[in-house]
Amino acid sequence: MLFRSKLVFVPEYRVFCEENACGNYDKNPACPPESGTVEEMKERALGYENTLVLQTTQDRLMDYRKAKLAHNKLTEQLAEKMKECGKTDLLIMSAGPYKHNSCMSAYCVDAQKMADAVGMQCWTNDGKFRYFSQILFRE
């Protein structure tokens, strides 16, 4: 778990969305520009006190699309469990846009600094891909 004050936002990351690297820019409502400006999205995230950082890893032999989808489904399932336990006001930052959830890139979150803050690996040379998502919530 991470306190919101530890989240690092890098507005310059929005260029990755604007270059349409994933193909969803101006097509998916969870993606920019419809999802909001950098400032609006940062303000939305900072409205929560805590964030649960989630990670899955995959080896290079797996289909990355399926692995990312599985990660996002697990994130969504956990969010539903949190709602059942009374945490009804949640914000999900997914690994890539997923349904109505914007990805961490759209929020301009620095994944490396986030991973470091919670003791997780982000970029390594072990041949594995890592997917991150977050569930932000209030106490």
Model-identified regions with their sequence ranges:
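Structured loops at beta-to-helix junctions and adjacent beta-edge loops in soluble globular domains
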Residues: 34, 55-57, 138
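Ordered, amphipathic secondary-structure segments that act as subunit-interaction surfaces
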Residues: 41-82
